[in-house]
């Protein structure tokens, strides 16, 4: 990518942005993981959880959400100023599941946010350790990406539900910083910008006054983040147009939707990181593993090795399939919701099925669900091979894709052809070629039409045996091309409801 030199690696975003060498980055990421692990151990002690209960992913999610809520300053301020009945703005909590007399019981716990902040800081050598918090946000975002299809959100902003492969990170909170921005898909950025422009259309004071100046700089910053994700000059030029607009309105929304559609073929660079639940880091730390000393990377073999040696359990509803629940969580752990299923099956060593074929609902359990016949089972999170995560979209080409999802956003840097339904994508590009972005539009359409079916992405890159820690012998997988490549294929996944 042309501007690569000006970008920071994600490890630098996760650390303090100073240029560091690989060893320092690994130590620094390891330190963040240590902090999450130590916090988790302490919370399990506070909550008197057994080892098994501490490895239950539902308990992990509750504990993670408690600390994220304790540090959500804007929301905490809002709650102080707008008190609502029955909600204590100073407290946070959630469901904790315990095994009592051979069955699972739900217990609602409540803690002072101040107390949670104290435990978190203590686990992180007195720091706020924002990077650890962001890491947990990205894990939650990856889990949402794997569990839900954002059809409604796409339709509301005037986009097409088939563009779901562009929606990585669509549920990340605004406060997720540079590391969060790096993992957001093209569609997510476009959706945030469209929402902003629509507010400006409906509220004439949105761009005005002191607040309006802040709004404007946020708008331009988001445009620049999106521009940085595009890999062709024409797409970037289009983003310059949108950013420089005096009074953003429907023309800009049109341009944004056009650029999002074009990203189905001319894919943007979106970072992928394997962020694991806190209940994986906790037991590793308590067994004496020193992440800071050993070093850790979110984009290499480390998360695969950690999952090979971890026991994680999950509650299972009466009619759910534990193997399907495992697939859902495995995909979330590797940020792979929009990756080609053929490649995922190869890496995992077991068949990875489309979302609509899975007999499983989300991992979290609603407060009104009956606990009487809840079982629990081990999540199978191991893999046959490992591969390096990518932050590029790979180059383009086409192949039959599906009714639901018509393109992929690669997670792993592994040689393959990238499926997308060219005729479907191109059909959306009839009509509007006039206006000030007409030359860019023409150029983008020309590039899309030139995308060749036989082109291979990530040429020469392969997967590696788990014993090959230094990535010396790439194994280039071969695929059955007749197989379905999209996860959200003509799909019936639940909607994400905030």
Curated annotation (Swiss-Prot):
Belongs to the influenza viruses nucleoprotein family. This is Nucleoprotein. It holds the Pfam family Flu_NP. The gene is NP. HAMAP family: INFV_NCAP. Keywords: Capsid protein, Helical capsid protein, Host nucleus, Host-virus interaction, Ribonucleoprotein, RNA-binding, Viral nucleoprotein, Viral penetration into host nucleus, Virion, Virus entry into host cell. Encapsidates the negative strand viral RNA, protecting it from nucleases. The encapsidated genomic RNA is termed the ribonucleoprotein (RNP) and serves as template for transcription and replication. The RNP needs to be localized in the host nucleus to start an infectious cycle, but is too large to diffuse through the nuclear pore complex. NP comprises at least 2 nuclear localization signals that are responsible for the active RNP import into the nucleus through cellular importin alpha/beta pathway. One of its GO terms (molecular function) is structural molecule activity.
């Amino acid at each position: 990518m042309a501007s690569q030199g000006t970008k920071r690696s994600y490890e630098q975003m996760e650390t303090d942005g100073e240029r560091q060498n690989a060893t320092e980055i690994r130590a620094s990421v390891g330190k963040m993981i240590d902090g999450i692990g130590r916090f988790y151990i302490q919370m399990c002690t506070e909550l008197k959880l057994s080892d098994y209960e501490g490895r239950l992913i539902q308990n992990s999610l509750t504990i993670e959400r408690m600390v994220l809520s304790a540090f959500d300053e804007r929301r905490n301020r809002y709650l102080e100023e707008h008190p609502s009945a029955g909600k204590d703005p100073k407290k946070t909590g959630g469901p904790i599941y315990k095994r009592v007399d051979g069955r699972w019981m739900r217990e609602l716990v409540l803690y002072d946010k101040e107390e949670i902040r104290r435990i978190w800081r203590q686990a992180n050598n007195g720091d706020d350790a924002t990077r650890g918090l962001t890491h947990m946000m990205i894990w939650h975002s990856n889990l949402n990406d794997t569990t839900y299809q954002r059809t409604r959100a796409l339709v509301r902003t005037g986009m097409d539900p088939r563009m779901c492969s562009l929606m990585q990170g669509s549920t990340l909170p605004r406060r997720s910083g540079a590391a969060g921005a790096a993992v957001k898909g093209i569609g997510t950025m476009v959706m945030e910008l469209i929402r902003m422009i629509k507010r400006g259309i409906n509220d004439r004071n949105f761009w005005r006054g002191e607040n309006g100046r802040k709004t404007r700089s946020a708008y331009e910053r988001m445009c620049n983040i999106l521009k940085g994700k595009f890999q062709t000059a024409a797409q970037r030029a289009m983003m310059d147009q949108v950013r420089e607009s005096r009074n953003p309105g429907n023309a800009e929304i049109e341009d944004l939707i056009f650029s999002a559609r074009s990203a189905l073929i001319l894919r943007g660079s979106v970072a992928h990181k394997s962020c694991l639940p806190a209940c994986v880091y906790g037991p590793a730390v308590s067994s004496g593993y020193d992440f800071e000393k050993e070093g850790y990377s979110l984009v290499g073999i480390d998360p695969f090795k950690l999952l090979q040696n971890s026991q994680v359990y999950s509650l299972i509803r009466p009619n759910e399939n534990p193997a399907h629940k495992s697939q859902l969580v495995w995909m979330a752990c590797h940020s792979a919701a929009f990756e080609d299923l053929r490649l995922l099956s190869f890496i995992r060593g077991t068949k990875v099925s489309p979302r609509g074929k899975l007999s499983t609902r989300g991992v979290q359990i609603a407060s009104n669900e009956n606990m009487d016949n809840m079982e629990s089972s081990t999540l199978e999170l191991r893999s046959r091979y490992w591969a390096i995560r990518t932050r590029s979209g790979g180059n383009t080409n086409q192949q039959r894709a599906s009714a639901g999802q018509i393109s992929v956003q690669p997670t792993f840097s592994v040689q393959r052809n990238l499926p997308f339904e060219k005729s479907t994508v191109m059909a959306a590009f009839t009509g509007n070629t006039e206006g000030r972005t007409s030359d860019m539009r023409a150029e983008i359409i020309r590039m899309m039409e030139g995308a060749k079916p036989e082109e291979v992405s990530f040429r020469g890159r392969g997967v590696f045996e788990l014993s090959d820690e230094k990535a010396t012998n790439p194994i280039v997988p071969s695929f059955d091309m007749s197989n379905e490549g999209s996860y959200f294929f003509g799909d019936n996944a639940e909607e994400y409801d905030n």
